[in-house]
């Protein structure tokens, strides 16, 4: 289970592990954010109902060892998921891990080995579209909001 963004994420709660430097975390999360907005259209990000964006670090046990990872946390309210979406950079393998954590702290979905240019599509699938096709999604949006969706 991942901690809520407001909770203490300091690794001093875990013996034998050093927290990442604040500047490093900020730099990594800034890169995550830039990669997300440069590879994902604004209307897609807007559909997630983002209400807050937080910089943090999370601790993940991988093969018995604890690792701190810088993470971008988006609080979202989409069709498929509402809660916190963590995009954490796994420096050991140069890929991202994405976690969807409900407001009760329970992990709903997890993806690993996500490339930078896949972050937006993975988040969109988790938060908004699920397994719907584009046509099914447009029909659901049309019915839900009484709108006609036009794909250009």
Task: Annotate the PLM regions.
Residues 80-85:
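Short, surface-exposed coil-to-beta transition loops
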Residues 72-74, 86-89, 95:
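Eukaryotic intrinsically disordered, low-complexity regulatory linkers and tails enriched in Ser/Thr/Pro
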Residues 92-105:
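Short, surface-exposed beta-strand/strand-loop-strand elements in extracellular ectodomains
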Residues 8-10, 14, 18-26, 105-152:
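Mixed-charge, Lys/Arg-enriched low-complexity segments
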Residues 14, 18-79:
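Negatively charged, low-complexity tracts enriched in Asp/Glu with abundant Ser/Thr
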Residues 1-7:
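Positively charged N-terminal leader segments that act as targeting/secretion signals
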């Amino acid at each position: 289970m991942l901690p809520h963004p407001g909770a203490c994420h300091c690794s001093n709660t875990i013996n034998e592990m050093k927290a990442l430097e604040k500047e490093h975390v900020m730099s990594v999360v800034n890169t995550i954010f830039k990669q997300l907005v440069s590879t994902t259209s604004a209307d897609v990000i807007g559909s997630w109902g983002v209400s807050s964006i937080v910089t943090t670090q999370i601790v993940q046990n991988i093969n018995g060892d604890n690792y701190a990872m810088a993470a971008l946390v988006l609080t979202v309210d989409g069709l498929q998921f509402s809660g916190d979406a963590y995009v954490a950079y796994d420096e050991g393998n140069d890929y991202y891990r994405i976690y969807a954590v409900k407001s009760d702290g329970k992990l709903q979905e997890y993806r690993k080995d996500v490339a930078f240019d896949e972050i937006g599509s993975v988040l969109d699938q988790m938060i908004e579209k699920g397994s719907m096709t584009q046509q099914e999604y447009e029909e659901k949006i049309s019915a839900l909001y009484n709108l006609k969706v036009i794909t250009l």
